[in-house]
């Protein structure tokens, strides 16, 4: 029974606390896009995964102004790109992260620097296979063999070169972040560990840390990869069972302990428990201003060393 509950709560194509009713789902033709700002779309054909997806690039205010024509920007890559900017594309919770509105408000208010946000769409029914480096024996035991160990290479060899070739990005670990939720949070943490010289900032929401029977937790001890800053958050009601939710929080606390053992403190690793929050984009949207401010509030441009 517990496995069934967990699978319903965590292992749908797009995660949420529970399935929305049909009445909540706007018809595609009737749904009005909620995108705010200058969002540009690209189609990426992946050799690594053998499929294609949309890459959604949100440019900061003033990007095309003449005064900024030589300016380069840090980049935050967000997984599950369908859910990042537009509620019409979020076909389970029908809610978005509102990264576009939130980022623009924080930039205009000078809480964070102007940055480019890239939404990387998931692969639909292959989402779990692409995001997970280890099998989810608890919540999704019948899943295909995971291919998530290829995901960091997919980002660095296919997604990032596309973005860098089209936009004025600031390359390098001090200028590059990655974020995601649930299985996307797992992929985010794995990318931070697998590509320590690439991703300097991690935004990890509601990660499913029992994958591989806890192997990803063990991967953080000893901690070899050293990102600049990491923000992790979890809701107190991620599942209907409070015992399971507390055990999930305990796994993330072990990751926090491992980061602290490597020298991190509250200035560069933050773990937030949101007591009444469930497993949905609405919760991640609510915590987003604090996450972005923590990660990028004191960011300064760091030039890439020349060979």
Which positions does each model-derived feature cover?
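Bacterial N-terminal signal peptides
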Residues: 7-16
